[in-house]
Amino acid sequence: MLNYTGLENKNVLVVGLAKSGYEAAKLLSKLGANVTVNDGKDLSQDAHAKDLESMGISVVSGSHPLTLLDKNPIIVKNPGIPYTVSIIDEAVKRGLKILTEVELSYLISEAPIIAVTGTNGKTTVTSLIGDMFKKSRLTGRLSGNIGYVASKVAQEVKPTDYLVTELSSFQLLGIEKYKPHIAIITNIYSAHLDYHENLENYQNAKKQIYKNQTEEDYLICNYHQRQVIESEELKAKTLYFSTQQEVDGIYIKDGFIVYKGVRIINTEDLVLPGEHNLENILAAVLACILAGVPIKAIIDSLTTFSGIEHRLQYVGTNRTNKYYNDSKATNTLATQFALNSFNQPIIWLCGGLDRGNEFDELIPYMENVRAMVVFGQTKAKFAKLGNSQGKSVIEANNVEDAVDKVQDIIEPNDVVLLSPACASWDQYSTFEERGEKFIERFRAHLPSY
């Protein structure tokens, strides 16, 4: 829907190109605005910048001249650019309106919105909601921080579709009228304080997600963080999720996901592992129920959805052994979540780039580790760690060799977990490449029939 006229003949300055700035500039031009794009990087050889210039859009790059503010433009800010950047700081002082392209997505689309934010879990929740829609006859288009520019997707959705948008705290700061029908706050912990300066500012940024909601809308949030999340501004109907007790919303009871007293699915039938993922699942299920997704489609998704690639991703089963790819676990905190996600014996594949870290903080999470296959620059450190805890330790050359060596020690019902707790750059260009090598080697060991 491009009949929105609120920006026609208005001066608009897009600060920061990247994907979102590029799409926002094109959209603003279609809406009749006088658009200028500004980026601190030199864009003289940038293909997107040249494309915009061919459309008659002015591109100023290499610095942030404050003279760009002299025509009192509306600012559309790339979410990654902090408010301390000179041109944004000056725009604030002058009282200029500052938006993000997520606000534009709301202005041009009549589709109802499911918006997801939170410190952890938002990508998993957004992806799971998208998968549940896909299993039904309804359409839910993913957008936002998950990699699909919201203002581009908003031009493609029908009023009968849902726009399912992952929002970072950076994007939420640019909200003026944005109003999701269903808002989800997965959790709020301390994060991005370099951008927000303090925890209170960060929390307030997250709360922007519901500031325009009315009594006809829904907020879904963690029951055990309700005091952090809720405020006097909240007008939406609030529903909760909890893995610990019955709440007004959705919860776990006697091993089942329960909504309004009705059992939906046994948690043992879920493919996605981990207590933290149980919370993500509850939030996604509740949102989809409210959006009218059939229970059958929700169950189909929960029994097949294997997670985000390289984030505790279920790869497959060989005989009785499940394999999980958690290559994105490049620090000990992420690996703590992974090790804590299984009750079965674990063969843990770990190691990678040596940044001078010690790994003793993982000891409390190693109870279910039966054996370790270690590789990379930190191989010796992990071998020492395993030996100190009486674990069986095998050394490998790399991830592929580690999967091969697993075959010599694996026992029925063992879980094979790649969760390196280290960056990949000692042996692989990216954590994605490392994860793909793990998956390829797993498949090579599958029996051929």
Curated annotation (Swiss-Prot):
Assigned GO CC terms: cytoplasm
Compartments, as annotated in UniProt: Cytoplasm
Key word ATP-binding present: yes
Pathway involvement of the protein, from the record: Cell wall biogenesis; peptidoglycan biosynthesis
Function: Cell wall formation. Catalyzes the addition of glutamate to the nucleotide precursor UDP-N-acetylmuramoyl-L-alanine (UMA).
Binding site for ATP: G118, T119, N120, G121, K122, T123, T124
Record's keyword terms, sorted: ATP-binding, Cell cycle, Cell division, Cell shape, Cell wall biogenesis/degradation, Cytoplasm, Ligase, Nucleotide-binding, Peptidoglycan synthesis
InterPro entries in alphabetical order: Mur-like_cat_sf, Mur_ligase_C, Mur_ligase_C_dom_sf, Mur_ligase_cen, MurD
EC number: 6.3.2.9
GO molecular function, one term: UDP-N-acetylmuramoylalanine-D-glutamate ligase activity
Similarity comment text for this entry: Belongs to the MurCDEF family.
Transmembrane segments annotated in the record for this chain: none
Protein's UniProt keywords contain Glycosyltransferase: no
Record NCBIfam families: murD
Name of the protein in question: UDP-N-acetylmuramoylalanine--D-glutamate ligase
Species of origin: Staphylococcus aureus (strain MRSA252)
Catalytic activity line of the entry: UDP-N-acetyl-alpha-D-muramoyl-L-alanine + D-glutamate + ATP = UDP-N-acetyl-alpha-D-muramoyl-L-alanyl-D-glutamate + ADP + phosphate + H(+)
BP terms from Gene Ontology: cell division; cell wall organization; peptidoglycan biosynthetic process; regulation of cell shape
